[in-house]
Regions:
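Divalent metal-dependent hydrolysis catalytic cores, especially in the metallo-beta-lactamase
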Residues: 28-60, 64-93, 97-98, 125-133, ...
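Alpha-helical scaffolding within the catalytic cores
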Residues: 59-65, 110-115, 142-145, 208-211, ...
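A structural motif corresponding to the C-terminal end of an alpha-helix
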Residues: 66-76, 115-126, 185, 214-222, ...
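Conserved, mostly hydrophobic/aromatic
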Residues: 6, 115, 149, 158, ...
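Histidine-centered divalent metal-coordination motifs
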Residues: 6-12, 192, 227
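Active-site gating/metal-coordination segments in enzymes
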Residues: 83-197, 201-205
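Mid-to-C-terminal alpha-helical segments outside catalytic/metal-binding sites
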Residues: 1-5, 12-69, 144, 148, ...
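Catalytic pocket-lining loop regions of alpha/beta-barrel enzymes
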Residues: 153-157, 164-281, 289
Length: 336
């Protein structure tokens, strides 16, 4: 089974100009490293246009586009982005096209309704994860929305964004009621405990070590560390060593590694007491270096590096597990 365990869909705001500016901020480091934008100052509009990131070229990613860009995938996990205020705008997952049939104007407070509509469009392909922000309307409202998203909308998991929304993952007053509800509902929780190049994100709130309190308190809650904690990868891996209910997915990290480095990374997991069954493939699609096919092929081709570095190949069954079977087992989807 081939599963993208981390992807996004639709838009982030009803204002298309803001959506482009947000995308530009996130991609600035990538374009600078490629030499397509100046490294020492902010680009001009003309330089953005020349780089290929034109305002008019920002695409809407709907179910059809996601399916098109994931050929051969059995499942695509689509993650909601819960509402928050940024630069005076309310942002979060919205359907600016109206193609999904959710009533009313685009509204980030309907983020889970939009993701549920994506799943209904192709229930055999898409797996929806809800999102809530306990700092937005308080933990009681977040808990109620999570219950609605799972019991009424049928979403299969929860994605949280502490560093972007400026709350700590181990905040007992804000976050623990959400974890308790997720545990009661029997759903996995994926948490962005990793870095971000966005100026407004708080790096101190992205450290994977903040999840240790969750592992100590909620031993029956499945916790997935997004992006394998990059840049704190070793910290994330040690949490997988310590807590039997912790997992990690590879999006973002896999895009920064060469195929050889990815092979070496997989080889060092088990000597560090991290079973490869705890690792999931993900892409963070539709980000700019996050082509699902290229990243899938990078992972499936790692054993071509074995002879070069004089190490044994990663067993095919373990690669198949990372590619999808591990995640399928956690969600009860069944493997192939």
């Amino acid at each position: 089974m081939i599963i993208d365990a981390h992807s996004h869909i639709l838009s982030l705001a009803a204002d298309p100009q803001f959506t482009v500016d947000y995308g530009r901020e996130g991609s600035l480091c990538i374009y600078r490293s490629m030499g397509r934008l100046p490294s020492h100052r902010l680009p001009t509009e003309e330089e953005w246009e020349a780089s290929g990131f034109a305002r008019s070229g920002w695409p809407l990613i709907g179910p059809a586009e996601s399916r098109r860009d994931h050929p051969g995938f059995d499942k695509i996990v689509v993650l909601a982005v819960s509402p928050q205020y940024l630069e005076g705008r309310l942002i979060g997952t919205v359907d600016t096209s109206g193609q999904l049939g959710v009533d009313g104007p685009p509204d980030p407070e309907k983020c889970n309704d939009y993701i549920a509509a994506v799943v209904r469009a192709e229930p055999g392909l898409f797996v929806g994860f809800a999102s809530v922000n306990p700092a937005f309307r308080g933990p009681a409202a977040a808990v109620a929305e999570l219950e609605r998203a799972v019991t009424e909308l049928g979403l299969a998991g929860l994605k949280l964004y502490p560093m972007y929304q400026h709350w700590a993952a181990n905040d007992r007053d804000l976050a623990f009621p959400v974890y308790r509800k997720a545990a009661d509902l029997g759903i996995p929780v994926m948490i962005h405990q990793a870095g971000s190049t966005r100026i407004d994100a708080k790096l101190e709130l992205g450290r994977p070590a903040l999840l240790d309190d969750i592992g100590r308190e909620f031993r029956d809650l499945t916790v997935i560390i997004a992006h394998c904690g990059l840049p704190w990868v070793d910290e994330a891996l040690f949490l997988l060593t310590k807590h039997p209910n912790f997992y990690a997915e590879l999006s973002y990290l896999i895009a920064t590694l060469t195929r050889r480095d990815l092979f070496l990374f997989l080889h060092r997991c088990e000597p560090a007491f991290v079973p490869l069954e705890k690792i999931f493939f993900g892409t963070d699609y539709p980000g700019f270096l996050y082509d699902p096919v290229k990243l899938r092929d990078k992972l499936m081709g790692v054993n071509e590096e074995a002879a070069v570095v004089s190490l044994p190949p990663v067993p095919a069954q373990k690669l198949d597990g990372i590619m999808g079977d591990n995640f399928a087992a956690v969600l009860g989807l069944g493997g192939t």
